[in-house]
Amino acid sequence: MASDFLPVHRALLSVSDKTGLVELARVLLAYNIELLSTGGTATIIREAGLPVQDVADLTDFPEMMDGRVKTLHPVVHGGLLGRAGIDDAVMAKHGIAPIDLLIVNLYPFEQITAKKDCTLADAVDTIDIGGPAMLRSAAKNFARVAVATSPDQYPDLLAELQAHHGQLSAEKRFALAVAAFNHVAQYDAAISNYLSSVSDMHTTLPLRHEFPTQLNNTFVKMTDLRYGENPHQSGAFYRDVHPQPGTLATFKQLQGKRLSYNNLVDADAAWECVRQFEAPACVIVKHANPCGVAVGTACSDAYEAAYATDPTSAFGGIIAFNRTLDAVTMQSILDRQFVEVLIAPYYDADALAYATKKANVRVLRIPSTGAMNRYDFKRIGSGLLVQSADSLNIHSGALKVVTQLAPTYAQQRDLLFAWHVAKYVKSNAIVYAKDNRTIGIGAGQMSRVYSARIAGIKAADAHLAVTGSVMASDAFFPFRDGIDAAAATGIKAVIQPGGSMRDNEVIAAADEHGIAMVFTGIRHFRH
């Protein structure tokens, strides 16, 4: 089959997206391909002055039920499913002519149901029946039929026709068939997800549950990975069929080696953390934990402060910025340390030119526009956990001062900064911060007080003074020992969720040490 080229004599076009339709029809006619079509598609082709036969004339059966029935006919499906050399006699007996090319895209179900005023009746009316049936018939018979589902496929399809004088290769037909089955599967998944989410069908606008009774997600493989988290594991990177703009899956790699599994995990943590800041910021991540974060007036000073938090851990890290990366900062990074991945929304031309001096460094560009991910997914044994994303940020007006001392303006600014960082540190998470930069980070300890001690050790190792700093904790302190440990290192203000049975003891400890403390009422566990 590898060298099996088949000529296209007859094509059926029935599309909801009319993009490129007339141009496509003209090229097909130039190769003497007979055109069949339905409804509005046929009208547009005919209005362009091009010859086309209505499917209703072919089947000798009119479109009916407001277009619900128009292609569900043996003449159509026989023309798509008939096997060359096997079904020829049967097709001739029943007057069925082969259809060699099918161009169909489906009713826009996802776009219609995304509208706030979409009723259940609107959704049901947008469920395509004839289109998927034809796509499946044509794709099943890829040995003789080619099928396209999107205007994005037209250029390659026409290029193949032109290169082979009106013929299509077996490889092209098979690739198009796979794409068609994937398209139908995605379409059916969207219908299932929508209908499975309807909790009350009797209201004017159907009440929908956030989590459907059956969840069908579709992902597209972007690349195979050298290996998974460890060399003995295999791995691949998939992205959502409709990725959220501004998220990691939309990256463009500008230079460097192939990304690894761990690169992608760390890059996602770094990018999600840095894009929450409004001012120029830098986040350095190692093993999915921030090891240095800072906000500055420019990328250069943000990087310098972030790096100073933990230079040892920054070695081989992933560095992300939320502003255009300039040449000065690029040179500072590459001359100072080994870095696996750099991420920014844009790069100066001089910065990219300097990056070529370290050709193995992976340089990613991700436009920062777009909302954060709406949901998080985590696999467990034979199961999937789904939750709304931890996207809730707090502002100064929502902080509850619970101690005798209230934080100063500068402390309040640093508390909110540290709180934003703590959200991206593995629990139990403790962050020491001062002047919009991290001083020490304690991550992933089973005991919160040990995370606090580690944050202090990190600060001491980096020769950063903790005295006068603030502390953020991703969850409440169950005992006063965490506050006692913080006071011993010189912490002067604390931000935490509150909610412990011993909050009064913890507050009393803060008052004893002259520490200002605020409650957020929000927890930021991260596992």
Swiss-Prot record:
Transmembrane segments: none annotated. Keywords: Hydrolase, Multifunctional enzyme, Purine biosynthesis, Transferase. One of its GO terms (biological process) is 'de novo' IMP biosynthetic process. SUPFAM superfamilies: Cytidine deaminase-like (SSF53927), Methylglyoxal synthase-like (SSF52335). The keyword Chaperone does not apply. PROSITE patterns: MGS. It catalyses: (6R)-10-formyltetrahydrofolate + 5-amino-1-(5-phospho-beta-D-ribosyl)imidazole-4-carboxamide = 5-formamido-1-(5-phospho-D-ribosyl)imidazole-4-carboxamide + (6S)-5,6,7,8-tetrahydrofolate; IMP + H2O = 5-formamido-1-(5-phospho-D-ribosyl)imidazole-4-carboxamide. One of its GO terms (molecular function) is phosphoribosylaminoimidazolecarboxamide formyltransferase activity. The keyword Magnesium does not apply. Its EC number is 2.1.2.3, 3.5.4.10. GO terms for cellular component: cytosol. Residues 1-149 form the MGS-like domain. Pathway: Purine metabolism; IMP biosynthesis via de novo pathway; 5-formamido-1-(5-phospho-D-ribosyl)imidazole-4-carboxamide from 5-amino-1-(5-phospho-D-ribosyl)imidazole-4-carboxamide (10-formyl THF route): step 1/1; Purine metabolism; IMP biosynthesis via de novo pathway; IMP from 5-formamido-1-(5-phospho-D-ribosyl)imidazole-4-carboxamide: step 1/1. The IMP cyclohydrolase activity resides in the N-terminal region. PANTHER family: BIFUNCTIONAL PURINE BIOSYNTHESIS PROTEIN ATIC (PTHR11692:SF0), BIFUNCTIONAL PURINE BIOSYNTHESIS PROTEIN PURH (PTHR11692). HAMAP family: PurH (MF_00139). Belongs to the PurH family. This is Bifunctional purine biosynthesis protein PurH.
